[in-house]
Amino acid sequence: MIPYTIILYTPQELNHSSYIQTGLFELKRLGIIDLKIKISAKKRLGRIIVSDTGEITETKQAHPKTSFYKLIDNIDKSEVFFACDLYDFANHFSKEALEKCDFIFKRSYDHNYLETLPKEYKNKVYPLGLTFGVHSNDKEESYKFLIGLFLSNVNVSFKPDRNLFKRLKKTVVSQKRHWE
């Protein structure tokens, strides 16, 4: 008997979630898990957005880059409902995942945005894994890489208006954090 079954609820978006599903199909192929697909056409509306100042807003927008799963222990029959939030923005959260899931694994994880969320929500959110902040200690010509990274991001954020210096500072801080 295979000890675990995962129910994969069909996602609203496949571009980001394909590597999660591919991994599950491979685990099934190896006989490590049983995998069942459940068709889900549910809209899953609702986003919770945390601003840089900590203000929380809710919208009725869909959060299609969040995929949902159920893990079943076939021995003791316990179940865990979880989601993988593969959205690019660390400050956007799926309302449905926060309300209904036991665990949420977030690709763009930043604990600073979690601090503002209610305790029952923030205790559910974990980093997805090696998706950001991964680097080699053997960085050949690292100064070129860092300069190119900085210049391309300054170019993207450059807009001559009253927030120019604020954006440039944010870019420098962000790139330094990602580099370290």
Predicted segments — roles?
Residues 75-180:
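Catalytic core of nucleotide-activated saccharide and alditol-phosphate transferases
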Residues 1-89:
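N-terminal pre-catalytic "stem/leader" segment of glycosyltransferase-like enzymes
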